[in-house]
Amino acid sequence: MNVQTMILTLQSFWAKQNCIILNAYDTEKGAGTMSPHTLLRTIGPEPWNVAYVEPSRRPADGRYGENPNRLYQHHQFQVIMKPSPLNIQELYLDSLRALGIDPLKHDIRFVEDNWENPTLGCAGLGWEVWLDGMEITQFTYFQQVGGMEANPVSAEITYGLERLATYIQDKENVFDLEWVEGFTYGDIFLQPEYEHSTYTFEVSNVDMLFDLFSTYEKEAERALARDLVFPAYDYILKCSHSFNLLDARGAISVTERTGYIARVRTLARKAARKYYEEREKLGFPMLKKEDAHDE
């Protein structure tokens, strides 16, 4: 099964579980969790079921395309179900069956790995899912989002698409994966992987990135002051990416690192609180949709 078919299979499976199928969010981020499709929508009482592929940039992990499984940018297939259904674990195992992986014929383990993202003020009970000794998925129940208690609890399933594909296709090198017939992963992503690594470690303008961080921080504050949550959150994501570039370049000391993370966390918590307040002003409209659907 090639990568494109994997994605289409997962989209079809989760669409049948009443998930909205969305596209990736168009701002750089380090994980699918950081998308507003997840981080903002898991705040407050409104129901929300969604699935999407998210390209995730981690500058420090760039290896110029020379490492077989470590990447500047990888892809996650993200699923959020809020509130978490009682059978969410069985649904996940069914999704593996849809990919041709029979849980009865493989060693599938849920290894406790409670999750925390201090930059965004998020935490939850979690497990790594191991398939025959390889981690393929992170499974998390959100307990805190943007510094706020999660109520109801959301279930997050994050498939590592590259890892899953290397297992399914029995490949050692991610760049050898078949994305679709006639095109490999390397055909599509090797050049950008090399160029982004070169930029991150050799070319990026450190002074400019420090200036951008401060500019984005101020603009996020300005947007929040006008109750504009989504524009503010875009700038918070840009702050986070600028920080990641600086961190990868070795431009931030250990002491400074803590301070920069705290600045992003402060903004994220303000955005989370503001999002809740704005949805509350609207009367939590998705609750009304759910009530109407139940009737």
Curated annotation (Swiss-Prot):
Q: Cross-referenced Pfam families, in alphabetical order?
A: tRNA-synt_2e (PF02091)
Q: Which UniProt keywords apply?
A: Aminoacyl-tRNA synthetase, ATP-binding, Cytoplasm, Ligase, Nucleotide-binding, Protein biosynthesis
Its UniProt entry gives the catalysed reaction(s) as: tRNA(Gly) + glycine + ATP = glycyl-tRNA(Gly) + AMP + diphosphate
Top-tier EC class: ligase
Q: Which SUPFAM superfamilies match?
A: Class II aaRS and biotin synthetases
What are the BP-aspect GO terms? glycyl-tRNA aminoacylation
Show the GO cellular component annotation of the record.
cytosol
Q: What is its EC number?
A: 6.1.1.14
Q: Where in the cell is it found?
A: Cytoplasm
Q: Does the keyword Plastid apply?
A: no
Task: Give the protein family.
Answer: Belongs to the class-II aminoacyl-tRNA synthetase family.
Alphabetical list of PANTHER family matching this protein: GLYCINE--TRNA LIGASE, CHLOROPLASTIC_MITOCHONDRIAL 2, GLYCYL-TRNA SYNTHETASE
Q: Know the name of this protein? A: Glycine--tRNA ligase alpha subunit
